[in-house]
A protein has these predicted regions:
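Adenosine-phosphate binding glycine-rich loop
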Residues: 147, 159-186
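Rossmann-like adenosine-cofactor binding region
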Residues: 65-157, 173
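Oxidoreductase and adenylate-handling cofactor-binding alpha/beta cores
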Residues: 1-10, 51-58, 184-186
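N-terminal Rossmann-fold NAD(P) dinucleotide-binding loop
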Residues: 46-47
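Short, flexible hinge/linker loops that cap or flank conserved catalytic cores
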Residues: 26-33, 54, 115-116, 158
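Short beta-strand "acidic-cap" motif of Rossmann-like dinucleotide-binding folds
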Residues: 60-62
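Glycine-rich Rossmann-fold phosphate-binding loop(s) that bind the pyrophosphate
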Residues: 35, 42-43
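Phosphate-binding beta-alpha-beta segment of Rossmann-like dinucleotide-binding domains, i.e.
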Residues: 1-36
Length: 186
């Protein structure tokens, strides 16, 4: 790769510079300070996400009907309590889901949920795929309710959609995590 790059430098570098500058517009981002992150599920991971978002200058609202006393005590006082999941969905620019897959959470994000989201919301689901109704997600993308759906387990249906961003599922892909798994087995 290095030699290919050196070879391209022998050509007209103004062309390369123009291509790089012209291409930047495709990668515009979103300013996070002042935006609202709604977190569904305030267990260990949800609390860590809340803390990180606060450090980035985001407003954070949380919803967790099963929050424990210990979890509540360790939650930042800057996290505002949503009165309901609907309340959270209506007021969040970003929605991050951190709940286990149970009968009560299957399709937690469904057509009704998507309908009340803010326009152009960004939905992050690093729980389980069945937490969301995929047809509702696709409809939300088509109607611009959902700007992006971000996950680490895309299904065939969602995998190649333009507004679906897939990240690798690497939560347990560290040397320490593998060592801990080995210790638990023994």
């Amino acid at each position: 790769h290095a030699l290919q790059f050196v070879d391209t430098l022998q050509g007209d570098d103004t062309t390369m510079n123009k291509q790089a500058e012209d291409g930047k517009k495709r990668f515009s981002g979103i300013e996070l300070p002042g935006r609202t992150l709604g977190i569904i599920g305030l267990g260990e991971i949800g609390r860590l996400v809340a803390d990180a978002a606060i450090k980035l200058g985001m407003k954070v609202i949380g919803y967790d009907p099963k929050i424990t006393v210990d979890s509540a005590w360790s939650l930042s006082s800057e996290v505002k309590k949503a009165q309901s999941i609907e309340d959270l969905l209506r007021h969040s620019d970003f929605i991050s889901v951190h709940v286990p897959l149970l009968d009560s959470t299957r399709h937690l994000i469904n057509a009704s949920s998507v309908k009340i989201m803010k326009q152009h919301a960004i939905l992050l689901n690093f729980s389980r795929s069945a937490i969301v109704d995929e047809d509702a997600i696709l409809n939300g993308i088509a109607t611009n309710k959902i700007k992006y759906y971000v996950c680490d387990f895309p299904s065939e249906k969602l995998q190649h959609q333009k507004a679906v961003i897939t990240l690798p599922h690497l939560g347990a892909s560290t040397q320490e995590a593998e060592d801990n798994c080995a210790v638990m087995v023994v």
